[in-house]
A protein has these predicted regions:
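Active-site entrance/lid segments in N-terminal catalytic domains of soluble metabolic enzymes
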Residues: 1-204
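Active-site/ligand-binding-proximal alpha/beta "capping" segment
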Residues: 190-226
């Protein structure tokens, strides 16, 4: 499968979803320019996700990517939150700003409730971070005809993702910004640079590999393509 079959785009470029700092506007611009625009949904409630998808579909007929987290939520720890607020208080005071720290997690893992909200859109492409949703939920998403990819930060994670039936693997090198998509290990010593990771993964999996991390110009894109991504 080549990139056009996987992405449905003019160029082999996926815009990295940046939760908390971008809206649908960037996704629309990238899709219109010939790449695959991405909407980060990990910090949005279902109402906001629906509104953003409707904005995208009302602005472009090009393919787009919905990105979701698949992490396990930790129990809310009030004592830990108090420590954080007290630690940060001097900085808020220095900036003459109100303390506005939300209670509970602002990062919501993919769920059947979210699937209920987006199913009517039959999204063409969904990417996951921190592994994959459980098997019945993944099967549900794939039943829509949606292409599914997820991030791997090690060769072992890439092999596991392929065994679960993903259509592509995002090889997230150590240079990548934002959340590290580690899910089979939490040891930072296992993390590889992009060139090393892509070189290993393309030799061991049969699905398309998408390179991610520190790619900032056409030379970087060409280098990743030459590696087999």
């Amino acid at each position: 499968m080549n990139y056009r079959e996987l992405l449905g785009t003019d160029f082999p470029i996926i815009q990295a979803p940046m939760a908390g700092v971008q809206s649908s506007a960037l996704a629309i611009a990238v899709s219109e320019a010939g790449g695959l625009g991405s909407l980060p949904c990990g910090m949005l409630n279902t109402e906001k996700i629906i509104n953003e998808i409707e904005t995208i579909k009302g602005s472009t007929s090009k393919p787009y990517n919905l990105n979701f987290f698949c992490h396990n939520l930790r129990p809310y720890d009030e004592n830990r939150q108090v420590i954080w607020r007290n630690t940060l208080q001097p900085y808020f005071a220095e900036l003459d700003s109100e303390v506005n720290l939300s209670l509970g997690s602002t990062r919501v893992p993919f769920s059947h409730d979210i699937a209920d909200a987006i199913e009517r859109f039959s999204p063409e492409f969904i990417s996951f971070h921190f592994g994959l949703p459980n098997k019945d939920l993944l099967k549900r998403v794939k039943s829509w005809g949606t292409k599914v990819v997820s991030s791997a930060t090690t060769l072992e994670e890439a092999i596991w993702l392929e065994s679960q039936g993903v259509h592509g693997i995002i090889a997230q090198g150590l240079e990548a910004g934002g959340h590290r998509g580690m899910f089979l290990t939490d040891k930072i010593s296992t993390q590889l640079g992009l060139v090393s990771l892509v070189s290993q993964v393309v030799k061991q999996v049969k699905v398309p590999v998408i390179a991610a991390g520190g790619i900032s110009d056409n030379n970087g894109v060409r280098a990743c393509l030459q590696l087999g991504a």
